Amino acid sequence: MEQKRKIVPPVYLLMTLAAMTGFNHLLPIAQFTFDPYTTYAGIALIAVGVSIAVVAAGAFWRAGTPVIPFEKSTALVTGGLFRYTRNPMYLGMIVLLLGAGLTFGSVGSLLPVPLFAWIIVRNFIRGEENFLQEIFGDEYLKYKNKVRRWL
């Protein structure tokens, strides 16, 4: 049941970052106080988000299973970050986006973030969950019942 997606999650991430930049300039509503601490917090969240996504992708590579959604999974990864969330790569992307929003410094820049999360759930996570259940059966169901989708 391999499905080919024309747009992969990192492309949605880049599109969301572009939308955030546009919203920041077009809808500069509720500007945050521009102090270095807000910027530092945003940069820290970006670094944490990238780290989460990279560590999670590394777990896939070490297990010999593809990172690209809907390619045939060869291993069910349940260790490391996957003990806490079933979707650490997507969670890392959301943390990165929240950090970017803090760095931009306006509520307007954060408006696309929930849309990104909704698109990821709708276009990827739901299908991936069904796909993994077909491949791994009860093993995946036990994992799914034990570990939350996000945190």
Question: Would you name each region that the model predicts?
Answer:
Residues 1-79, 91-151:
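Membrane-anchoring alpha-helices and their flanking helix-loop junctions
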